[in-house]
Regions:
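Acetyl-CoA-dependent GNAT
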Residues: 1-55, 61, 66, 79-80, ...
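Short, contiguous strand/loop micro-motifs
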Residues: 5-6, 69, 92-93
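A generic local structural motif
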Residues: 16-20, 45, 70, 95, ...
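Short, flexible active-site-adjacent loop segments at beta-strand->alpha-helix junctions, enriched
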Residues: 49, 64, 97-102, 120
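Loop/helix-junction capping segments adjacent to catalytic residues or to phosphate/diphosphate-binding pockets
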Residues: 54, 72, 103
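Conserved acetyl-CoA-binding loop-helix of GNAT-fold acetyltransferases
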Residues: 65, 71-84, 107-111
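Conserved active-site alpha-helix within GNAT-family acetyltransferase domains
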Residues: 76, 100-118, 123-124
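Conserved GNAT acetyl-CoA-binding A-motif
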Residues: 86-98
Length: 126
């Protein structure tokens, strides 16, 4: 909960809501990383199956590493673990959305083989 709150701010799932979601897993995968026995970061990702495509797809929806644990390979390890899980599920491609101004994240994704998709991202608040 504390890592999610630090990353996303107000409006995050409460510890009870998160526990309920984790107790009834759906397409979401949540990975935690620890450094010296303390939570250091997390990755949330979705494995998506569609009636339109023969192979599942996946998306990294959240990736956060505590400031004091950055530049130690934590994000890379989380991402590698998620990519391995995706390969085991038959996923052919993984997408990730990050801020245009988040140069460190963009550099990480590019080092790990991701490339800009050229697709426009649209959102409508409800």
């Amino acid at each position: 909960f504390a890592l999610n709150l630090a990353f996303n701010g107000e409006g995050v799932a409460s510890p009870q809501e998160a526990a309920l979601a984790l107790a009834h897993p759906g397409p979401e995968r949540v990975l935690l990383a620890f450094v010296a026995g303390e939570p250091a970061g997390f990755l949330c990702g979705l494995l998506k199956r569609s009636a339109c495509y023969s192979r599942p797809s996946a998306e990294v929806t959240e990736l956060y590493v505590c400031p004091g644990c950055r530049r130690q390979g934590v994000a890379r390890q989380l991402l590698e673990a998620f990519l391995d899980a995706c390969r085991q599920e038959g996923v052919e491609a993984v997408t990730v959305l990050t801020g245009e101004d988040n140069a460190p994240a963009q550099a990480l994704y590019q080092r790990m083989g991701f490339s800009p998709s050229g697709e426009a991202h649209f959102e409508q608040g409800l």
